[in-house]
Amino acid sequence: MPSHLSAAEQKQVQTVIDRARGDSTVPHSAQDSIPFQRMFPDGICRVTDNYYTKTIQFQDINYQLAQQEDQTAIFEEWCSFLNFFDSSIRFELSFMNMATDASNFEKMVRIPYQKDHFNPVRTEYSTMLRRQLAQGNNGLTKTKYLTFGIEAESMKQAKPRLIHIEIDLMNNFKRLGVRAKLLNGKERLHLMHDMFHMGDHDRFNFDWKWLPESGLSVKDFIAPTGFAFPKNRIFQMGGMYGSMSYLQITASDLSDQLLKDFLDMESSQIVTMHIQSVDQNKAIKSIKHTITELDRSKIEEQKKAVRSGYDMDIIPSDLATYGKDAKALLKELQSQNERMFLLTFLVMNTGETEQELETNVFQASSIAQKYNCNLRRLDFQQEQDRKSTRLNSSHIL
């Protein structure tokens, strides 16, 4: 900065320079908007300088078709599964309904002929599979993933702990009777590519050996043609329109049908649950503080009643209900080996047109209202929320 300028002039010049440089925190390309630093071949993803994740794909279990006793047993096993996660492990459950190219499915179900007498049987079976495909889920592929992550100072420190957690989780899935598979780096990139290219059916072509030869990064092989945010509640990802919403849970309890109804929608969408276990001591301390505040409010209401000449035992029903619920929760935490979890429930609806998108968002909102909850669309936070669905177990909002 020239020394002959006054302090006010120097400040003015610096303001112009900063404006020209732009905000370094704003993504300048589609690649910059993909929220991770590096993907390793073994499936470990470095999201930030000190945060690392892995992803497991898991299959369905016949919960809805099971008898009541079996459903109770499955639910108890699932509770034990969730209690495995301590406060140092963040995890994300992702449920994806994505439209796929019908021609690829037809190739998968086509049974090649062989030099024997069973070709007529193969033809009949292939025809039956194609007929079922045509009557199926509108070409939707429905998959489920669990992504878990930890904080560590380096890859060397993170890797052994992630492997240990992975082994425990795979054993927990096995006890539930659920088939599960760890995704390697290429499979995670393929999955993210499919998420970014929902509407164009662009094929994923990638090999690790291409990186040093081309000078490209893995993000160049998965990024869409671009991201755009034309309106405060809508974003564009390539040729697809999308909208992010969060579930506002206002019901006293949630039915296990809520998630099923979301996933039964016949449209491409991603439902994500970001879950963080709260440290047991902090959870108990927080509940005790809440009970103390409720008791203080109760005393204030009783004082008002006495001054007004009313019965002091008559207090607002909300106070009585909240106090009862808080004490029940404290008992569960202290004596029943329960954990407290923080949950963010996100829904990404999509559509090939804005009108189709709005129709799908309306349907999802109707499902939420059916269970006395609200689906709230985020104003001016579509990009941050969209990043939170990318299987990195890092909630950005």
State where each predicted segment sits.
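Positively charged, low-complexity/disordered segments
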Residues: 391-397
